[in-house]
Amino acid sequence: MKLISNDLRDGDKLPHRHVFNGMGYDGDNPAGTKSFVVTCYDPDAPTGSGWWHWVVVNLPADTRVLPQGFGSGLVAMPDGVLQTRTDFGKTGYDGAAPPKGETHRYIFTVHALDVERIDVDEGASGAMVGFNVHFHSLASASITAMFS
């Protein structure tokens, strides 16, 4: 699998437009892909368990691009696609917000799944989604961006 972003480059500083307040995917889907899950996770958050910034589930297998603003609530989601609860306590994308003076990694990951949907609702945590993804993942690809 391969993840491509017009906004992010693996290992680079996270662009300011992604700081608290799009990326695209293209190609090499594994055989049997029936849906995708996209996440943004900060493993460096001072919580002992990281911080989920974005979780979107049940993207159709023919999804190739998520337009910029897809997680903002301003872009319509296809039927059946859900954004689940982040560690900010709500759905949708919330950008980088590391403590002052710290540099954090923001890992954007797309997971190809062998099921058309995972059975979670909008209140599901990133950990719960990750648990469900674990049992249905065919492949995943990530881009890691930095911000301080």
What are these regions (language model features)?
Residues 1-148:
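N-terminus-centered regions that define maturation/targeting leaders and the start
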